[in-house]
Amino acid sequence: NLLFPDGERHFVKSVRYFRKAIDDDPMLAHEVAGFYAQEGSHAREHQRFFTILEEQGYELDEFLGEFRHSLRVLQRILPESVQLAGTAAAEHFTAIMANHALESRFLDDADPKVRHLLLWHATEEIEHKAVAYDVLQRVEPSYLVRVLGMAVASLFLAYWWQRGTRL
């Protein structure tokens, strides 16, 4: 949850960089517009959730500041195509988790508002799970770039998920 707002803003930025390359595909352009809207909604709602956590005494500023810094470093050093491939990979991971959230009972005992937030988010993640991948295939179909993006996303997410469990 802690990675969502900034991560989703990064996802939108990585897709938006290639927007002109998809202008001639109205269906993909429509899907991308929906992706932007959904990711923006997710970021706003999770940011509201952060406010509640902070009101309850959770200290998020240091963690989130370090996470934002690490995203900026990746944005500086990685080519845009690898950033997009990383977004496609992260969206794949998110879709797997979303599917699990929707099909399992692990959220049954969660606070009803938290459960609603996470299930709403999961449903929308399933809806746009392939958009970043479709853009990637259109602008940079290289398997090597896709694998590199998956490696970067895997290591990045594993590190930050592990860090987030210590809060």
Regions found by a protein language model. Give the residues of each.
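Non-heme di-metal
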Residues: 1-167
